[in-house]
Amino acid sequence: MNKGVGIGGMFFIVIVSFLFSCEEKTVDYGFDNYYVEIVTAQNENEFLSDNGKIIVVSSSKNKNNYTAGDRVLINYTLLSEDASGDRYNVRINWSSKIPLGKLSLTNDSTINASAVEPIFLESVWLGRNYLNMSFYLNYRSITHSIGLLADSMRMESDTLRMYFIHDSKNDPPGYPSHAYLSFDLKDVLRNPEKTRQISIQINTSNFGNKIYGFEY
C-alpha cells in the first residue's frame, strides 16, 4: 500500500494512505453485474451515493467499518432495490477509503508560486458537492503534497476558479501509483438555489495544462 501523498493546501498537510488495501483480495464475481463508485459513509451499514441513492450493505462478507463522512470507493453487486429506486441493498465485493480534502482559500501570489508538477489524469468529475479525481502519479519513497487552491478575493465572481497543485518533493523516479481522491466544496458552494460555474486547472502529462469546467 502506498503511503506517499499528503492532501491539503498550502496551510495544512495531512498524511493519508492511498489505494488500495494492504490485503490483497481475490473476488469471484461469477455472472453477477457489479458497480464501482465513490460514495460517502453514513454509518457502518449505509453509504450515500453522489446521485442521492442510499446503499445498504446486506452482507457482512468483505465489509469494512468506516466513519460517517468518509469517502469510500466501493465495488458492489445489487441484490434488491425498493419501489422508488432510491434505496439499494447490496453485497460489497471490495471497498477502500480514499483521501478527502477541502478547497484552500489563499491569494493570487501563493497560487502562482505553488508547484504544479504534472499527473497522468484519468478523469475529473463533479458529484454532489464533491470534486472527484482519478489519476496516476510517479511515486517512490517521498511523500508528495497535493491540494486545491482558489483566490479568496475572487470568490464572488461568476466562475469559481480552482487550481490543482502537486509537489513531488523531489521524490526519485519510481512507479505509477493509481489514486482516487475527493475535495469537499460544500463550504464554498453554499447556495443550492443558484447555478454556479466552476473550473479547475490541472497540469497533466497526457493532456497538458488544461482547464476543466463544470456547472454546479
Task: For each feature predicted by the language model, list its residue ranges.
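C-terminal motif of bacterial Sec signal peptides marking the signal peptidase cleavage site
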Residues: 17-21
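First exposed extracellular module after export/assembly in secreted or surface-exposed proteins
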Residues: 32-216
